[in-house]
From Swiss-Prot:
GO biological process: pyridoxine biosynthetic process
Complexes and interactors: Homodimer.
Record-listed E.C. numbers: 1.4.3.5
Pathway(s) it belongs to: Cofactor metabolism; pyridoxal 5'-phosphate salvage; pyridoxal 5'-phosphate from pyridoxamine 5'-phosphate: step 1/1; Cofactor metabolism; pyridoxal 5'-phosphate salvage; pyridoxal 5'-phosphate from pyridoxine 5'-phosphate: step 1/1
Source organism of this protein record: Blochmanniella floridana
InterPro entries reported in the protein's UniProt record: Pyridox_Oxase, Pyridox_Oxase_CS, Pyridox_Oxase_N, Pyridoxamine_oxidase_dimer_C, Split_barrel_FMN-bd
Protein name: Pyridoxine/pyridoxamine 5'-phosphate oxidase
Pfam families membership: PNP_phzG_C, PNPOx_N
Gene: pdxH
Length: 214
């Protein structure tokens, strides 16, 4: 077991390739695509991102969700319409995302507002999922209290039997969200804590870039 007295000594030097302005792209999503591919080649779950939302009192909440689609303008994730995150988004669509690729000394932070994609788009993605995953979506009322894991498993097995030779119906509560991106910050660890940070901010459809002090 790690002794609490030793936690303050947990540190390492971040040794990375140079990250300069000349490495940047005009559209931050092009750099995002490059970094995502490099993360994919080196770490598990590179599409896992920490989504931050706030409730009606201003209390922030965070959780990992999976990036499922992106293009030159946006990124997309999916969830239950009745989940805690979706309820927060319904009240306040402003969110923040973080891709925590600390294993390769990188991090990307994204801010913006989200809006629902069409039912047709959500349905298209839903049916790319493995059938057992489709069934588990029906079995779980996300974020609600359950008495035990057994209750959830029994419901799943009952539904699995029901849809053994049938298609799983599309859940009316399954929703996808697109992000209208306002800013993207690319961070790369540097030796002696001289990290590199570049912030893209959008103003009237144009991206402006600034280097930030670490």
């Amino acid at each position: 077991m790690l002794e609490l007295s030793k936690i303050h000594n947990l540190r390492r030097e971040y040794i990375s390739k140079q990250f300069r302005r000349s490495n940047l792209t005009k559209n931050p999503m092009h750099l995002f695509s490059k970094w995502l591919y490099e993360a994919y080649c080196q770490i598990p779950d590179p599409n896992a991102m920490c989504l931050s939302t706030v409730d009606h009192t201003g209390q922030p909440f965070q959780r990992l969700v999976l990036l499922k689609y992106f293009n030159d303008k946006t990124i997309v994730f999916f969830t239950h319409l009745n989940s805690r995150k979706a309820i927060h988004i319904n009240n306040n669509p402003k969110i923040s995302l973080c891709f925590p690729w600390n294993i390769i000394n990188r991090q990307i932070i994204i801010t913006g507002s989200v809006y629902k994609i069409s039912k047709k788009e959500a349905q298209k993605y839903f049916y790319t999922r493995p059938k057992n995953n489709q069934i588990s979506t029906w079995a779980s009322k996300q974020s609600t209290i359950i008495s035990s894991k057994k209750v959830l498993k029994n419901k799943f097995l009952k539904l699995k039997k029901k849809y053994f030779q049938k298609s799983v119906p599309f859940p009316h509560f399954w929703v996808g969200y697109k992000i209208n991106i306002n800013s993207m910050e690319f961070w790369q660890g540097g030796i002696y804590r001289l990290h590199d940070r570049f912030l893209y901010k959008k103003n009237k459809k144009k991206w402006y870039i600034n280097r930030l002090s670490p």
